[in-house]
Regions:
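Rossmann-fold NAD(P)-binding glycine/threonine-rich loop
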Residues: 1, 15, 19-23
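General beta-strand structural signal in soluble alpha/beta enzymes
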Residues: 2-3, 54
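Active-site rim elements
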Residues: 3-5, 135
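Domain-scale recognition of functional cores that engage charged ligands
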Residues: 5-14
Length: 171
């Protein structure tokens, strides 16, 4: 099945699979490319992966400079407000034996995610992108943060996945 198959979310899920194949190969692990969810989860565990960090930075520029105190971004207004105001949500691996005091588990689903009691716009995470380097982003809810955790979780061993996003011109 293809879930939210655009560039983001979507394509990052495919990048995680390719990165895992590269890591396993570079480590000299003996494996065949997995064809099942359980196979992908086992390969992730065999490679010792405990976390996947998805970082994004909006670097698009307009032809004319942005006026002071004007917010410009590639997110739709509705999407930005929705993601910023809803509780911060992230994949939470089964290897984690605790959750933060201000976090809760979901009543339904696979158990591969938690949510925080504050909105994503109030939750900062240290992040990194290749061009700008280190950055302080926002922990925003994104489909792939949970779908990747769910897809790659071995129920005894898992991983944490979150998306740290820094909108343009927010510093």
């Amino acid at each position: 099945a293809v879930s939210t198959g655009g560039a983001n979310p979507g394509m990052v899920s495919w990048f995680v699979k390719q990165a895992l194949l590269n890591i396993a190969s570079d480590m000299g692990l003996q494996f065949a490319e997995p064809t099942t969810r359980e196979g992908w989860a086992k390969l992730m565990a065999d490679a010792g992966v405990k976390g996947v960090h998805i970082a994004e930075r909006d670097t698009q520029r307009a032809k004319s400079p942005k006026p002071a105190n004007v917010f410009v971004n590639t997110w739709s207004v509705e999407g930005f407000i929705s993601e910023a105001l809803q509780p911060a949500e992230l994949g939470w691996g089964t290897h984690e034996r605790w959750i933060p005091d201000h976090a809760r588990t979901h009543d339904t689903g696979s158990g591969a995610a938690i949510f925080l009691l504050g909105p994503g716009a109030d939750t900062r995470v240290r992040s990194w992108c290749p061009t700008p380097g280190p950055q302080l982003g926002y922990l925003v809810t994104h489909n792939e943060a949970i779908s990747i955790a769910d897809h790659f979780t071995v129920r005894e061993e898992g991983e944490e996945i979150h998306l740290g996003r820094l909108p343009s011109a927010v510093r």
